[in-house]
């Protein structure tokens, strides 16, 4: 019994130490649990915030585009501008936004975009000219977007016209290098006589029709080709023939000759008893029977 009483203080101390270790372990585990929970919360919060920011940035991708227009003196031209918003899945029009048309730096017309994002702006020129113009979002617009530009061709309907397939101007569609002498020879044809239409086949990978129009315009400018009216068409074999009929029906009946590279382009003219020149010389058997063939652009004028 005396031994027990002697050991009691030691036993009590041991239990106190054991209890302290237990309490410390419990507190440490609870503390770590809280820290991990908070870390997880902040991680989730960070991911959600980043996703929201990226989503907002994506929603803010807005484009304003426009393409060339064609009219005659004292006749109103309808210029179509399109305001779109590109999301992760689709591109949609933005309606209810004011759009301004600028000619020579001055606001010439205003219009609101419809539900499809299109705004129709009217402009009338009194004289024959090739008029560069710009469209932009109006001062009261809720969006911030870069300006877009194109050309308005104002031509007399009695003036001779020619159509040129863009592919006939390039050595290689991939490299985008111009055919030798093409710019100089086309410049001679258009300086005093022809008004020129450039016909471009729409490549969906290159963007919308308006974007392809802008790319073609910039390439022609960079390569010093004469300014003309640009038409963007689908790659279907009947696309140019249908457009040719539309132009004739609209009064542009002086369009009687085309210079192109593809068989489909040449046939569209020949089927309507019009003239077609193919350049460069196609492979044997590829040229339609009545098509004229030029080996290079220096020979084109001789065939017209």
Which residue ranges define each predicted feature?
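Hydrophobic alpha-helical signal peptides and transmembrane signal-/tail-anchor segments
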Residues: 13-28
């Amino acid at each position: 019994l005396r031994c027990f009483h002697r050991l009691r203080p030691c036993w009590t101390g041991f239990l106190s130490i054991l209890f302290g270790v237990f309490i410390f372990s419990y507190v440490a585990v609870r503390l770590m649990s809280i820290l991990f929970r908070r870390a997880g919360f902040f991680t989730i919060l960070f991911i959600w915030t980043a996703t929201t920011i990226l989503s907002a940035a994506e929603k803010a991708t807005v484009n304003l585009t426009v393409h060339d227009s064609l009219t005659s003196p004292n006749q109103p031209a309808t210029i179509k501008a399109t305001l779109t918003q590109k999301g992760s899945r689709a591109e949609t029009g933005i309606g209810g936004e004011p759009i301004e048309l600028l000619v020579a730096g001055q606001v010439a017309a205003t219009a609101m975009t419809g539900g499809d994002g299109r705004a129709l702006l009217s402009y009338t020129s009194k004289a024959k000219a090739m008029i560069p113009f710009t469209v932009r979002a109006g001062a009261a617009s809720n969006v911030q977007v870069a300006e877009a530009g194109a050309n308005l061709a104002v031509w007399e309907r009695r003036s001779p016209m020619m159509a040129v397939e863009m592919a006939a101007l390039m050595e290689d569609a991939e490299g985008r290098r111009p055919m030798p002498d093409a710019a100089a020879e086309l410049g001679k044809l258009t300086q005093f006589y022809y008004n020129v239409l450039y016909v471009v086949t729409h490549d969906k990978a290159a963007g919308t029709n308006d974007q392809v129009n802008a790319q073609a315009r910039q390439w022609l400018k960079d390569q010093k080709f004469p300014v003309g009216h640009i038409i963007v068409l689908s790659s279907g074999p009947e696309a140019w023939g249908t457009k040719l009929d539309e132009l004739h029906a609209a009064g542009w009946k002086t369009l009687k000759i085309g210079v192109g590279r593809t068989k489909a382009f040449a046939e569209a003219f020949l089927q309507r008893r019009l003239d077609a020149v193919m350049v460069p010389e196609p492979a044997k058997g590829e040229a339609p029977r009545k098509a004229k063939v030029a080996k290079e652009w220096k020979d084109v004028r001789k065939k017209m």
